[in-house]
Regions:
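Sec-dependent signal peptide recognition
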Residues: 1-8
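Long, compositionally biased stretches
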Residues: 16-133, 151-163
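C-terminal motif of bacterial Sec signal peptides marking the signal peptidase cleavage site
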Residues: 11-14
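Short, solvent-exposed secondary-structure boundary/capping segments
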Residues: 134-142
């Protein structure tokens, strides 16, 4: 009978261990991970890249600093220019704080201009090397997703080519 009386005591003692903050039981989340330098722009081919979004940005419109003129220029794809097909990749939304119209992909090894196609719609954009293994997927910018009409939550299959 006395043993039954001790069961709640042991159960509550176990709860206390579970309620300790993470810093008391192990390293902080993300410890050992070096974040990218804040305010360091990604390499770009655009001589006049869009400005970074405001620090307090919370909405899609606040994060998307690419001008309507830049989006229209991206859609002006020359259908007569010869292209080299690089293949297809699955693309998800990349860091929304990185402005511009770009695709980070393992299909290229150097920064270059290319054409990305999604459901019959083409857009010129920067192809940035992701450093990933072939088949590892790609990240696409917020502005590029909006330009191509890709829903922001979609894992989109896109075709990639270079001129």
């Amino acid at each position: 009978m006395r043993i039954l009386a001790l069961i709640p005591v042991f159960a509550l003692a176990a709860c206390e261990t579970m309620m300790q903050p993470v810093s008391a039981t192990g390293p902080a989340p993300g410890a050992g991970v070096t974040p990218a330098a804040a305010g360091t722009p990604a390499p770009t081919l655009n001589p006049n890249p869009p400005p970074p979004p405001p620090v307090a940005a919370r909405t899609v419109d606040q994060f998307d600093t690419t001008s309507d003129a830049d989006k229209a220029a991206a859609l002006a794809v020359d259908d007569t220019a010869p292209v080299k097909d690089l293949g297809t990749t699955l693309a998800t939304l990349g860091p929304p704080a990185e402005p511009g119209i770009w695709l980070k992909t393992p299909l290229v090894s150097a920064l270059t201009m290319g054409v990305v196609s999604y459901k019959g719609k083409d857009a010129k954009m920067e192809l940035r090397p992701s450093g990933g293994e072939a088949g590892s997927g790609s990240q696409i910018s917020l502005a590029a997703m909006q330009t191509l009409g890709i829903p922001l939550t979609e894992i989109a299959e896109v075709s990639v080519s270079v001129e």
